[in-house]
Amino acid sequence: MESFETLEKLLSYSFKNKELLIEALSHPSLRQHHEYKDDKDYERLEFLGDAVLNLVITEILFRNFANYNEGHLAKIRSYLVCKETICMVGAKLTLKNYIIMTHGEEVAGGRDNLNNIENATEALIAAIYLDSNIETTYDIIEKLWAEFIKVQNLTDYDPKTALQEWAQASDHHLPIYRLIKREGASHSSTFTVLVKVKDYEQTGTGHAIKEAEKNAARSLLHRLKND
């Protein structure tokens, strides 16, 4: 596991209370470990971090997209706080290298588990908020999410249409969407869709197939824009 100092440099933030940082990176599997004395893991911080992230992203969009209506802003926010985007932020921070977990969880692929990365990223946001204030947290989130907010200029009307137009302009076949996973009860399912254009592919999740397709298209457009 890498030094927390490296993570703090990536965040451009140094924790006053290091225990908050440790809690934000402590996987729930530790609670079943007989040598683990503390009863804290990142689940409570994740709960708070989810709310803080939604608040900050909402305010960023409100300030920067003055001409967009409520429905449009909600769609953009849905992308910015979805699992894929949060995990891409976590990947930028190489967060998987810092999560504290049991050997069994690690052997089972816990470091590459997207749920773990998403949860730890949200918990980290909460830890920063509790260690500092909303203004500092706002600045850090705005910096970490800047490239994903910027890509909205390309996808603001419909990411599926934007991806189709890119494919046609590049003389590629039209995008192909495929449902690869459905999780949860029938009334609250989460769908995962894979979109492929030529040799490029990306996944997206949502509570409806169309939402998952749009999030997959957004993620692929973001990748294409940065390649």
Curated annotation (Swiss-Prot):
Positions with a binding annotation for Mg(2+):
E46, N119, E122
Gene3D superfamilies from the UniProt entry? 3.30.160.20, Ribonuclease III domain
Q: Identify the GO cellular component terms for this protein.
A: cytoplasm
CDD domains in alphabetical order: DSRM_RNAse_III_family, RIBOc
Q: What is its main location?
A: cytoplasm
Function according to Swiss-Prot or TrEMBL? Digests double-stranded RNA. Involved in the processing of primary rRNA transcript to yield the immediate precursors to the large and small rRNAs (23S and 16S). Processes some mRNAs, and tRNAs when they are encoded in the rRNA operon. Processes pre-crRNA and tracrRNA of type II CRISPR loci if present in the organism.
Q: Which PANTHER family match?
A: RIBONUCLEASE 3, RIBONUCLEASE III
Q: Which family does it belong to?
A: Belongs to the ribonuclease III family.
Give the matching NCBIfam families.
Answer: RNaseIII (TIGR02191)
Q: What is this protein called?
A: Ribonuclease 3
Q: Which gene encodes it?
A: rnc
